Design a protein with these regions (language model features):
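Conserved alpha/beta core of the MobA/IspD/sugar-nucleotide pyrophosphorylase nucleotidyltransferase superfamily
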Residues: 2-4, 180-184, 197-198
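Short loop/turn motifs at secondary-structure junctions
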Residues: 3, 49-51, 122, 151, ...
């Protein structure tokens, strides 16, 4: 079984749920304290053993490429002003992983975005991390899913339980307990008008 070393981060959405904040700034670049959301996601993937990352973008999101690239003028100024610690952080961004980008020319949904990664992933197993879904923890969520894949050899999805009231906003999986926090699920999705389960995708 091949090791999961690649990750796909769909980040081509319009960010309509967080307007007006995302009108001029991609939602993936909105800061959480001192880092943009997407940096947390890339760092999570790297901590889980991912070495190659494809970020799927669209027009108006080149700021993400700039964020993970070198910035010689800024780096020079930081060194000249004695800010070595900040300099190291800025330089490290360009070396977190092998990050490439592809543009989704039409915003046609998540499935289409992931299909744009076909040439990148080839026949290898890969992780999908949402560009605006930050999960913080000592043990990276992506790493937990990779371990589950390594144990089962099957596709793995991370889910969370939500309240009965919130379930209307999600699609749901029918799950059966397996062990610990692991569940098996059927391939059929429960229609959104049938809120009988509280484990959304």
């Amino acid at each position: 079984m091949k090791t999961v070393r690649k990750a796909v981060i769909p980040a081509a959405g319009l960010g309509t749920r967080v307007l007006p904040a995302s009108k001029a700034m991609p939602k993936e670049m909105l800061p959480i304290v001192d880092k943009p959301a997407i940096q947390f996601i890339v760092e999570e993937a790297v901590r889980a053993g991912i070495t190659d990352i494809l970020i799927i973008t669209n027009r108006g999101k080149s700021i993400m490429e700039d964020h993970f690239d070198r910035a010689p003028e800024l780096e020079e100024r930081l060194l000249a002003s004695g800010k070595k610690e900040v300099y190291d952080e800025v330089v490290n961004l360009a070396h977190l992983a092998n990050i490439t980008y592809i543009r989704q020319k039409e915003t046609r949904g998540l499935g289409h975005a992931i299909s744009c990664a076909k040439a990148f992933v080839g026949d290898e197993p890969f992780a999908v991390l949402y560009g605006d879904d930050v999960i913080l923890g000592e043990d990276p969520a992506c790493g937990q899913l990779i371990r589950a894949y390594n144990e089962t050899g099957k596709g793995v999805v991370g889910v969370k339980e939500v309240s009965e009231e919130a379930i209307q906003r999600y699609s749901s999986l029918k799950v059966e307990p397996l062990h610990d926090n692991w569940f098996t699920c059927t391939l059929s999705l429960i229609h959104i008008s049938e809120p009988t389960r509280r484990t959304p995708i």
